[in-house]
């Protein structure tokens, strides 16, 4: 799959995923396990790479992050405008 990088970012939700994960007191490993229950094949290392902005996030992964973290998609995407500055 071709890697798309937007303004030097592989994803635009890394900070928000980490913020909500920590706020909910969920470890990266626990988040990965919750994602796997939903059928998304990610492990703790993948969560770490996503949070460090080293890995892209697919649309179905984004939907599952929202479910696992109990947030709406617009909450994860709310700072999108800052990537245009």
Model-based region annotation:
Residues 1-24:
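A short, Lys/Arg-rich alpha-helix, primarily the initiator
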């Amino acid at each position: 799959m071709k890697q798309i990088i937007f303004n030097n970012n592989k994803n635009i939700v890394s900070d928000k995923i980490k913020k909500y994960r920590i706020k909910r007191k969920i470890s990266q490993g626990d988040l990965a396990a919750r994602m796997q229950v939903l059928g998304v094949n990610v492990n703790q290392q993948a969560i770490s790479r996503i949070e460090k902005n080293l890995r892209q996030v697919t649309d179905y992964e984004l939907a599952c992050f929202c479910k696992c973290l109990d947030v709406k998609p617009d909450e994860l995407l709310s700072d999108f405008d800052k990537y245009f500055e």
